[in-house]
């Protein structure tokens, strides 16, 4: 995923060092917890290797950004059987698609129904948190807020919980507005879980497996329950000071050639509460 402003080599590379790997094995007990997400399903054959490192994974309900298909569908049982928790994701609309406040509200409601239908079909339990991927950052315009809140309300009515994946970085070209804070301040009493992106070094550690999953307080969004601190490919305009990405700009899972990932820290080993057992 990639936040745009208005928001995957060899088995072992400089991205992850061998010494960092054992220290970051999937945690038990208290958090925070390391997880990953990626637009393409990593394959059943890689799940056990990834689970030795990560507690949870992203799981798309519709086509991820820039993709014409979604190959995560149908793999929920395999992912849970491997021991993963979930970050359940639905790719939202860009501003150019919204046109007007009334149209944005209609799209938010219809997209929420699509997310709910797929979540149910995939077997996610009621009260699972579905994160809406808000790709564009900065201050949200009226049409964007109309879409977001219509989506959130419809998801909640259906018995699921709503989350939003959005920027946690101050937009210097937009009055230093932080998208997550802007959405929260206008949300009223809506119950929204926030997944904040801040891949700038610092505060992000970059593409590395730290001794412990980084504290979410470091993300700059105090109320975030998930922090994405590295993206593939590296965003040079934001994460240019991070020196530990692979030479091709991606962040690779150790020991799994070709599997590039985004890195996350969360307060729960199952941030969407998507497991059934």
Task: Show which residues each predicted segment covers.
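Substrate-binding cleft of extracellular glycoside hydrolase catalytic domains
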Residues: 28-158
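Bacterial N-terminal signal peptides
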Residues: 7-19
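Structural beta-sheet core signal
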Residues: 59, 88, 164, 195-196
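Sec-dependent signal peptide cleavage junction
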Residues: 20-28
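Aromatic-lined carbohydrate-recognition surfaces of secreted/lumenal glycan-active proteins
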Residues: 158-176, 226
């Amino acid at each position: 995923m990639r936040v745009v402003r208005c928001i995957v080599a060899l088995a072992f590379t400089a991205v992850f060092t061998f010494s960092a790997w054992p220290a970051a094995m999937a945690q038990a007990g208290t958090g925070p917890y390391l997880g990953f997400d990626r637009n393409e399903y990593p394959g059943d054959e890689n799940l056990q290797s990834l689970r030795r490192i990560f507690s949870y994974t992203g799981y798309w309900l519709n086509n991820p950004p820039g993709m014409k298909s979604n190959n995560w569908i149908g793999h929920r049982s395999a992912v849970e059987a491997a021991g993963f928790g979930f970050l359940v994701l639905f790719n939202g609309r860009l501003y150019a698609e919204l046109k007007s406040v009334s149209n944005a509200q209609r799209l938010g409601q219809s997209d929420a129904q699509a997310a709910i239908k797929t979540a149910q079909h995939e077997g996610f339990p009621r009260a699972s948190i579905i994160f809406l991927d808000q790709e564009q950052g900065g201050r949200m315009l009226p049409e964007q807020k109309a879409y977001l809140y219509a989506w959130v309300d419809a998801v909640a009515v259906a018995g699921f919980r709503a989350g939003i994946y959005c920027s946690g970085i101050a937009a210097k070209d937009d009055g230093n507005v932080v998208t997550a804070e802007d959405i929260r301040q206008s949300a009223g009493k809506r119950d929204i879980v926030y997944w904040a992106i801040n891949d700038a070094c610092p505060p992000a550690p970059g593409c590395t497996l730290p001794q412990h999953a980084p504290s979410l307080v470091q993300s700059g969004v105090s109320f975030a329950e998930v922090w994405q601190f590295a993206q593939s490919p590296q965003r040079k305009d934001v994460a240019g000071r991070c020196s530990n990405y692979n030479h091709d700009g991606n962040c690779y899972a150790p020991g799994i050639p070709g599997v590039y990932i985004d890195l996350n820290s969360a307060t729960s080993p199952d941030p969407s509460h998507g497991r059934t057992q």
